[in-house]
From Swiss-Prot:
Part of the viral RNA-dependent RNA polymerase complex, the other subunits are probably the host ribosomal protein S1, EF-Tu and EF-Ts. It holds the Pfam family RNA_replicase_B. GO terms for molecular function: nucleotide binding; RNA-directed RNA polymerase activity. The keyword Iron-sulfur does not apply. This is the catalytic subunit of the viral RNA-dependent RNA polymerase complex. This complex is involved in viral RNA replication that produces (+)-stranded genomes via a complementary, (-)-stranded intermediate. This is RNA-directed RNA polymerase beta chain. It is an enzyme of class 2 (transferase). Keywords: Nucleotide-binding, Nucleotidyltransferase, RNA-directed RNA polymerase, Transferase, Viral RNA replication.
């Protein structure tokens, strides 16, 4: 076991350089083929070279934090403006006949209506709070039980529904009456959601919105209902592997097209939702969504139906793309596999031209860089395949300078594009350069996703463990309100214990006692074993 000073010294290694940059420089020094997936001399390692630093915040021709945020907001406002135009002027018939589009939308409407049968009886069944920041609670106080115990926020149109939801849970109802009295004082009314951005790549951030607490609670209930119903037609939003497998199959024979959209969740117009959903479902979703946000001190009314951050946006967009894609397949008499996961769409290649025209007509813009309909490269849900070979790149999203960073980078290098249990021999020199920086005690692990040890053929040594404090009802006295919140949240969960975990930046070491499993090896390591 390391003494504390030795651990501290190891973790705070001053490399004076970013290992991510060193890795990229090494890749640039290699004589590689083309990074274009459609090129005859496509080389997966060249593809990795061009992709690995695209999300690094401070390299190449990257933009500043302020500029990335500004561009994200501008992109969101552009999508919102397009939605407003569609809400006023209708669909764009410049690339598709009005009769064809009307027929496809009518079939899609029938598919959605059938899918959502029984919504009015189940829309409150699976409501829940998220662990994310909201309009009422900062991230450090965003645990669901704290939102239940505190005075949650809600928009005026959703207030009565929020009260009705509380009354379905007797302990919650009793707590709200005891704490806040009259139901008109249970929640804090707010105008709408709050705009913010999260990192996407080194050029632009991704814009999203923090929803009011009770709006999110109700939105997640509606989203859960849609999610369950989509499973009945083969669309499982809890599992990305179906889309990933379809992408692999499409890369073998080119029979399936993978389509990705740009700003899909911000391009769902109010008009499209009105046309596709049953009136009572539309009315309910319209009440629990947020129609306004604050931008530069001014109240802004959304033209889009819901933003990223809304509790049902992902399920709603998935249902819309499923209905449109299925409608096109039925109208063309095409059978075959259909995969939907958010805006990751997989359809038979015969349907691709019509689907792209329909999507453009109803306000969605294809992401040309991530849409593959010809050749043998396919991408969906983070999976990248070329003729059945896994080409998924890994991304260095931050400077790789600490010990955990370097160990993770080494493990990603070893695990990239393995064939028959063998790692790419071209990467061994840079892997060894980084591995030599790591103390021998941390070598010998076998899980390539870990950043707590180095995966290598060595005998397992020790592993880093992040120090975290877990609070439960047995080792911590919660305030009265939080105790009530924990109980109500437990009733929502149905089982288990409601815990509060507080992580720190400190680590400790423990012996690596994992079961030893086979790991990918570099050919150079096999040669060394033979020679020894």
């Amino acid at each position: 076991m390391f003494r504390f000073r030795e651990i501290e010294k190891t973790l705070c290694m001053d490399r004076t350089r970013d290992c991510a940059v060193r890795f990229h420089v090494y890749l640039q020094s290699l004589d590689l083929g083309s990074s274009d997936p459609l090129s005859p001399d496509f080389d997966g390692l060249a593809y990795l070279r061009d992709e690995c630093l695209t999300k690094h915040p401070s390299l190449g021709d990257s933009n500043s934090d302020a500029r990335r945020k500004e561009l994200a907001y501008a992109k969101l406002m552009d999508s919102d403006q397009r939605c407003k135009i569609q809400n006023s002027n209708g669909y764009d018939y410049s690339h598709i006949e009005s009769g064809v589009l009307s027929g496809i939308l009518k079939t899609a409407q029938a598919l959605v209506a059938n899918l959502l049968t029984g919504f009015e009886s189940h829309f409150l069944n699976d409501c829940s709070f998220s662990n994310g920041a909201s309009q009422g609670f900062k991230l450090r106080d965003a645990a669901p039980f704290k939102k239940i115990a505190g005075q949650a926020t809600v928009t005026a149109p959703a207030y009565d529904i929020a009260v009705a939801a509380v009354k379905t849970c007797a302990p919650w109802y009793a707590y709200m009456q005891e704490t806040y009295g009259d139901e008109t004082k249970w929640f804090r009314r707010v105008y709408g959601n709050g705009l913010f951005s999260v990192p996407k790549n080194n050029k632009i951030d991704r814009a999203a919105c923090k929803e009011p607490d009770m709006n999110m609670y109700l939105q997640k209930g509606a989203g859960s209902f849609i999610r369950k119903r989509l499973r009945s037609v083969g669309i499982d939003l809890n599992d990305q592997t179906r889309n990933q497998e379809l992408a692999r199959l499409g890369s073998i024979d080119g029979s399936l097209a993978t389509i990705d959209l740009s700003s899909a969740s911000d391009s769902i117009s109010d008009r499209l939702v009105w046309d596709l959903l049953p009136p009572h479902v539309y009315s309910y979703l319209a009440r629990i969504r947020t129609s306004f946000t604050m931008i530069d001190g001014r109240l802004h009314k959304w033209g889009l139906f819901s933003t990223m951050g809304n509790g049902f946006t992902f399920e709603l967009e998935s249902m819309i793309f499923w209905a449109l894609s299925k409608s096109i397949m039925l109208s063309m008499g095409v059978t075959g596999s259909l995969g939907i996961y958010g805006d990751d769409i997989i359809v038979p290649v015969e349907c691709r031209p019509t689907l792209l025209k329909v999507l453009s007509a109803v306000n969605f813009l294809p992401n040309e860089e991530k849409t593959f309909t010809t050749g043998y490269f396919r991408e969906s849900c983070g999976a990248h395949f070329f003729k059945d070979a896994d080409m998924k790149p890994f991304y260095c999203k931050r400077p790789m300078e600490t010990l955990p960073d370097v160990m993770l980078l080494c493990n990603r290098i070893r695990g990239w594009q393995t064939v028959g249990g063998m790692s790419d021999p071209r990467l061994f020199p840079i892997w060894k350069e980084f591995a030599d920086m790591i103390p021998p005690k941390f070598k010998g692990g076998c899980n390539l996703d870990r950043d707590t040890y180095l995966v290598s053929p060595d005998k397992p040594g020790v592993s880093l463990v992040r120090i975290a404090k877990v609070r439960s009802g047995f080792n911590h006295a919660f305030p009265y309100g939080h105790e009530n919140g924990r109980y109500v949240h437990w009733l929502h969960m149905g089982s288990g214990e409601v815990l509060e975990t507080i992580s720190s930046a400190r680590y400790r070491c423990k012996p690596n006692s994992e079961w030893r499993t086979q790991i990918p090896l570099f050919p150079q390591e096999l040669e060394a074993c033979v020679l020894s």
